[in-house]
Each structure stands twice: as C-alpha cells, then as structure tokens.
Amino acid sequence: MTKITRIIKEARDQARLTALDFAQGIFENFVELHGDRSFRDDGAVIGGIGTLNGQPVTVVGIQKGRNLQDNLRRNFGQPHPEGYRKTLRLMKQAEKFGRPVVTFINTAGAYPGVGAEERGQGEAIARNLMEMSNLKVPIIAIIIGEGGSGGALALAVADKVWMLENSMYAVLSPEGFASILWKDGSRAMEAAELMKITSHELLQMEVVDKVIPERGFNNHELLAAVKEEIAAELDSLSQLPLEQLLENRYQRFRKY
C-alpha cells in the first residue's frame, strides 16, 4: 500500500473520530442546537455551544456516520443547504455574543441532489464564504477526515486552518479527478499524487497552517492534544485587535 493510498483510506475510515466526538470530547457542557429556522434540521451538520477552560465557544462540524443506519441519518456527511444555513445561524449568534468559533470538517462534499440545488446549495455555500470572511470573532477550522470541495471550504474560511495528519483536503475526490481528466476512475490514486491533497503537502504550500500528529496517539490522547492546541490558539487570536484579526484573515486567503 502506497503512502497516499494509506492516507486516503485512513481519512475515510468510519472508525475515525467524528465532529461530534471532538465537540463532546474537547468542550465542557457541550449543548447541541438544531435547525436553520428556514426549512429543517440537517443531520449531516452538528453545532452548538460549549466551554473551553471556562470560555464559551461555538462549535460546528460536518458529521459522518459509523454504520449504514447512522450514515443514512447523516446523509453520509454531505450537507444540504439547510445544514450550511444552520452553521451560519450559529456563527452569527457567536458573533452577537462574542464567542469564538471552531469548526470540524469531514465531508466528501456538499450534497449534489436536485432538492439541494432547488433550495439554493450554491447560494448557501457562497453566503458562508462571504459571512465567515468578515465574522467579527476568531475562527479555527480543523479538517479531521475528508475535506472535499466547496462543501468543506464553506466551513474553512478561518483565521487558522489545521489538518489532522491523516486527513485530506482537495477541490474534489481523486476518483472524480481521474474520471474527469482521464475518463477512468480506477486511476484515482495516480490522481491523488498529482493533486497534493495530504496534510504535509498542503502545509508546505501554506494552504493550511498546522498539521496535528496522529501517529502514536489513541483517541483520548488525540482529543487532549487538539484541545491544548485550540486553547492556546484562541488565547493568541483573542489578543488581536478586531481590525487586525479581520485583515489577517483577508490576507490569508487573498494571497492565493
């Protein structure tokens, strides 16, 4: 098994920690909130409020299931537009009350169904990008598994973007890339090598700001390590004047 094959397999592993695992394992007294107040609740997206060392934090994430029944409930981690609108509702609420935002991302991409398109999937993603770029509180985004296309980017316009070591982040899946470029989905691993989707490659290209090691950690230790990193970064970001925070975020993405 090649390195890229192993990373993709691990990124998609159903046994990986989910967004809800991180929310409940890192933030004390996490309370999940539901619904976008326009259409319905989307099971593919979780969000709520918890505390980190006594500081209130808004947490949102994209949730995959661990079995078929759970994946059907979670739509295999592919959010509908109401899911993105739920995250925006919670992030604007965080802005109102001065709470920092932490996002956990694990999705192959936004749901591409007809109903999702009719309800404004593209608009929902675009609005998240626009609103997050000017959200007046610190934002940390962490890719914990797959980071696929605009569906992932819709939660990743942040002051700091991190990846777990065995996660991936790309404009589309390697299978989709191979099908488009060569009309042959079986060449997915070859496509993955060209796409530069691994955490260390993206860190080198400055697409992400930090890689959190996984090797040698059990789940409890990984949660503790991520908690420590988040606490330290939020403390640092909270020291910045608002104008500087927003300018740094703008320049972070403008350089691409």
UniProtKB/Swiss-Prot annotation:
Keywords: ATP-binding, Cytoplasm, Fatty acid biosynthesis, Fatty acid metabolism, Lipid biosynthesis, Lipid metabolism, Nucleotide-binding, Transferase. It catalyses: N(6)-carboxybiotinyl-L-lysyl-[protein] + acetyl-CoA = N(6)-biotinyl-L-lysyl-[protein] + malonyl-CoA. GO terms for biological process: fatty acid biosynthetic process; malonyl-CoA biosynthetic process. InterPro entries: Acetyl_CoA_COase_a_su, ClpP/crotonase-like_dom_sf, COA_CT_C. Acetyl-CoA carboxylase is a heterohexamer composed of biotin carboxyl carrier protein (AccB), biotin carboxylase (AccC) and two subunits each of ACCase subunit alpha (AccA) and ACCase subunit beta (AccD). PANTHER family: ACETYL-COENZYME A CARBOXYLASE CARBOXYL TRANSFERASE SUBUNIT ALPHA, ACETYL-COENZYME A CARBOXYLASE CARBOXYL TRANSFERASE SUBUNIT ALPHA, CHLOROPLASTIC. This is Acetyl-coenzyme A carboxylase carboxyl transferase subunit alpha. It comes from Streptococcus sanguinis (strain SK36).
